[in-house]
């Protein structure tokens, strides 16, 4: 049978502790990366909504205004 020594047991425990610490550090890094990716995704959505609200909506409203009110008024003024 294999005889365990205090040194081999101590080395085994140290290796287990080191690997547990490395796994915990990796889990924390992964959590931070997921949070960062989530914030980036949320920020992208916010920017897209802002572009629609600031640029596209006013232009479409202006086009509708021109089509529904200005154009008929100009045609009526010509006639």
From Swiss-Prot:
Acetylation recorded as keyword: no
Protein location: Host membrane
GO cellular component, one term: membrane
Coiled coil as UniProt keyword: yes
Transmembrane segments: 37-57
The organism's place on the tree of life at top rank: Viruses
Job of this protein: Inhibits host cell division leading to filamentation. Does not prevent host cell growth, DNA synthesis or chromosome segregation. Does not seem to be essential for productive bacterial host infection.
Identification of the protein by name: Inhibitor of host cell division protein
Gene: 56
